[in-house]
């Protein structure tokens, strides 16, 4: 994946945990705005190896790690489908669940017989049962470090998202934690950009200095 904007001499490659530091505060703020308002006609361009522009729906922008809701409808749909698939691979467990659902249905319908109204019902599917149970990802006890890993893991689920951008996020973490985060992005083979307003000690990064010169830097 590559990005380009007016101050770059040429497009910049983004892959496997690229860190871009922008020292000019006003430029940093403007670029964050460009990402936030990104569409195919914006000054900021994001495109793949085939020079195909990335749609706004394919960009996942995170400006607040703890405030990001992992349990979106899209994530839950994928999670529930994945659980159904796992259960289908275990015939004994699936059979036990079906038997219990049938038993519960019989009990409820037996009670409904006394009702004066004519009552009918639909059989509940395994997917509907999982939804009804409110199955979701637990996030209440997350630290910032745990939450960013959950976001990175969720990004793999979101097949329609092609690039993940974190804004001003690495300042929350120690050197060792940053190393673990970047290592995980490499192992995940994910296109992830960390957009930062200041240099990060001890890691490889690209710095757009106040003279608007982009240089690789490893301190």
From Swiss-Prot:
Cofactor(s) the record lists: Ca(2+)
Binding site for Ca(2+): 138, 150
Disruption phenotype: Plasmid transformation is still inhibited.
GO biological process: defense response to virus
Keywords (A to Z) from UniProt: Antiviral defense, Calcium, DNA-binding, Metal-binding
Gene3D superfamilies attached to this UniProt entry: 3.40.50.11940
Molecular function terms, GO-annotated: DNA binding; metal ion binding
Assembly behavior: Homotetramer.
Role, per record: CRISPR (clustered regularly interspaced short palindromic repeat) is an adaptive immune system that provides protection against mobile genetic elements (viruses, transposable elements and conjugative plasmids). CRISPR clusters contain spacers, sequences complementary to antecedent mobile elements, and target invading nucleic acids. CRISPR clusters are transcribed and processed into CRISPR RNA (crRNA). Binds dsDNA. When the CRISPR3/cas system consisting of cas9-cas1-cas2-csn2-CRISPR3 or just cas9-CRISPR3 is expressed in E.coli it prevents plasmids homologous to spacers 1 or 2 from transforming.
Family the entry assigns: Belongs to the CRISPR-associated Csn2 protein family.
UniProt-recorded name of the protein: CRISPR-associated protein Csn2
Organism: Streptococcus thermophilus
């Amino acid at each position: 994946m590559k990005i380009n904007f007016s101050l770059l001499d040429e497009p910049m490659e983004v892959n496997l945990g690229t860190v871009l530091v922008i020292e000019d505060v006003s430029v940093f703020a403007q670029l964050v705005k460009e990402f936030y308002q990104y569409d195919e006609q914006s000054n900021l361009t994001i495109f793949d190896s085939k020079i195909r522009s990335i749609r706004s729906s394919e960009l996942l922008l995170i400006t607040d790690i703890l405030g990001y809701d992992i349990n979106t409808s899209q994530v839950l749909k994928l999670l529930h489908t994945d659980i159904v698939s796992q259960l289908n691979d275990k015939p004994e467990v699936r059979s036990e669940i079906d038997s219990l659902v049938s038993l519960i249905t019989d009990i409820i319908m037996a009670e409904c017989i006394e009702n004066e109204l004519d009552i009918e019902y639909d059989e509940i599917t395994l997917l509907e049962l999982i939804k009804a149970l409110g199955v979701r990802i637990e996030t209440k006890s997350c630290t910032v470090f745990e939450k960013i890993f959950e976001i990175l893991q969720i990004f793999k689920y979101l097949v329609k998202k092609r690039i993940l951008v974190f804004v001003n996020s690495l300042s929350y973490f120690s050197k060792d934690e940053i190393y673990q985060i970047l290592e995980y992005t490499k192992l995940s083979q994910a296109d992830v950009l960390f957009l930062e307003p200041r240099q990060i000690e001890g890691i490889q990064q690209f710095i757009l200095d106040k003279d608007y010169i982009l240089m690789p830097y490893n301190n």
